[in-house]
A protein has these predicted regions:
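N-terminal charged helix/coil linker that caps or initiates catalytic domains
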Residues: 1-26, 60
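Glycine-rich phosphate/adenylate-binding loop
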Residues: 2, 153-154, 164-167, 182, ...
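Hydrophobic/small residue at the entry helix of a nucleotide-binding pocket
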Residues: 34
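Conserved S-adenosyl-L-methionine
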Residues: 44-49
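Glycine-rich phosphate-binding loop and adjoining beta1-alpha1-beta2 segment
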Residues: 54-89
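Conserved SAM/SAH-binding loop
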Residues: 99-106
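Short amphipathic alpha-helix with an adjacent loop that forms part of the alpha/beta core around
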Residues: 106-107, 130-138
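Glycine-biased, low-complexity coil/linker segments
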Residues: 111-112, 149-150
Length: 276
């Protein structure tokens, strides 16, 4: 009998679990340091359908920690590089690559969406998309839609690996409002102690500036709901953080080490596999 590449996983998890993984659809938003590792581990575990979204290209400064980043891939889309790896691992995977940025919706002074945003938000041809438009689009594609109808609250699971506050909170808020399962990564930068990485509810996190900012934003939106996250209890090394100018949604850059984002990605993948 010919060996299957999933045999060792099936030996551990059992055929029923493997069937659930094969029929699952996971959306990974952000495939840099954390998200790319999560996506690859989900693929290797046998998740049958993945959507990866990120408009970034590989930069030399990514090489120290990001799975898609090598000297030969500098300048290429991270989604493109990662997709090649995922298809080489599982040639039968149902894989959707979206080289786009997820952005918070534009608001008018009265608090509603701007007209241009209302008209264009469902177009995948743009390089920017709101979480609402993204999830609406996924729910309207037959092979991605929920078996229960309506939005994609059935078999879809979301992995949030966005590292900027506004789009991150927009995605989290949309998922929470729709009741779509989601797990989120908090900050791994300026930290190096692998033993302090934890799972927790967002509202129980500490020593994490990103988590604090996310809590504040969601609370203002009336979304004080349970949200599983991976974070580190280690206090950030302030000496490893520098201010930057001219970068969208970014005021600072933190020093990083190779293994921290990878382990955050491991935690996210394990959570999804356990919950599916």
């Amino acid at each position: 009998m010919e060996n299957k590449w999933t045999d060792r996983t099936a030996l551990l998890l059992g055929e029923d679990k493997m069937s659930r993984l094969s029929n699952a659809h996971v959306l990974v938003v952000g495939v840099g340091g954390v998200g790319a590792y999560a996506a690859e581990l989900l693929c290797r575990a046998g998740v049958g359908e993945l959507t990866i979204i990120d408009a970034d290209t590989v930069n030399t400064t990514n090489i120290n920690r990001q799975l898609p980043a090598t000297h030969s891939t500098v300048g290429r889309l991270k989604t493109e590089v990662l997709a090649e790896r995922l298809r080489d691992i599982n040639p039968e995977i149902r894989l959707h690559e979206l080289p786009m940025y997820v952005e918070a919706p534009l608001l008018s002074p009265q608090g509603g969406k701007l007209q241009s945003e209302q008209e264009d938000e469902n177009e995948f041809s743009r390089d920017v998309i709101t979480p609402s438009a993204l999830l609406d689009k996924l729910s309207n594609v037959p092979e991605m839609s929920s078996p229960h109808g309506g939005n994609v609250g059935g078999r879809l699971f979301i992995v949030d690996a966005i590292d900027t506050i506004a789009p991150k909170c927009a995605l989290l808020g949309e998922a929470l409002r729709r009741g779509i399962p989601i797990v989120s990564s908090m900050g791994a930068g300026a930290k190096s102690d692998i033993t302090q990485i934890r799972f927790a509810d967002l509202w129980d996190t500490y020593h994490c500036g990103l988590a604090k900012a996310v809590r504040t934003r969601l609370k203002k939106e009336g979304l004080r709901r349970s949200l599983p996250v991976v974070f580190s209890t280690e206090q950030a090394d302030r000496r490893a953080v520098i201010t930057v100018e001219g970068e969208q949604n970014k005021k600072s850059t933190a020093g990083t080490i190779s293994y921290m984002p990878a382990v955050f990605g491991c935690y996210l993948a394990e959570y999804v596999i356990r919950k599916l």
